[in-house]
């Protein structure tokens, strides 16, 4: 995969699986996302510039006991199969929840060439993701796959009430 390339993979989960996943996400415990430009979470939250909410279900290659991991593993396996990635290690499952007016920053998930980011959308929203300064709107059951060292940022919804996604970080081996 080239550094500036974004691969879109559709129809990873059925509509029923996505609805069940969203139901799990609605009842899951969430944490305020740390904003890169603030040392304190309270000020940006009350100023309407909070970064949304997130929760990890796998960190540094170690899974947590989470009801979200079943779908995350399935999505990761399907993406790697379609991209013919045979040897990889899952480093992170990070779930995000955004509301209108949330503030996000451009960032990199990793800094070396051997990592890929998989961004999965369980529903269609008017939010999306900027990758290499190009906007990709959320589409139900679609994954956006790109080099983790590429700058990107989530974009909250403006008309839709909430936006969920899964960010998977994998290390690929040759």
Summary of predicted features, one role per range:
Residues 1-87:
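Non-heme Fe(II)/2-oxoglutarate
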């Amino acid at each position: 995969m080239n550094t500036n390339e974004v691969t879109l993979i559709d129809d990873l989960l059925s509509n029923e699986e996505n609805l069940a996943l969203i139901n799990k996400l609605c009842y899951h415990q969430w944490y305020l996302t740390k904003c890169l430009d603030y040392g304190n979470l309270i000020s940006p939250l009350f100023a309407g510039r909070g970064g949304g909410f997130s929760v990890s279900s796998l960190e540094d290659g170690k899974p947590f006991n989470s009801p979200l991991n079943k779908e995350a593993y399935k999505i990761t396996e399907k993406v790697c199969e379609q991209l013919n990635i045979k040897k990889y290690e899952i480093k992170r499952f990070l779930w995000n929840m955004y509301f209108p007016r949330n503030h996000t920053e451009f960032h990199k998930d990793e800094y070396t060439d051997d990592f890929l980011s998989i961004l999965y959308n369980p529903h269609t929203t008017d939010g999306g993701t900027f990758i290499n300064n190009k906007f990709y709107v959320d589409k139900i059951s679609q994954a956006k796959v790109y080099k983790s060292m590429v700058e990107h940022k989530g974009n909250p919804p403006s008309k839709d009430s909430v936006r969920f996604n899964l960010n998977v970080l994998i290390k690929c081996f040759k």
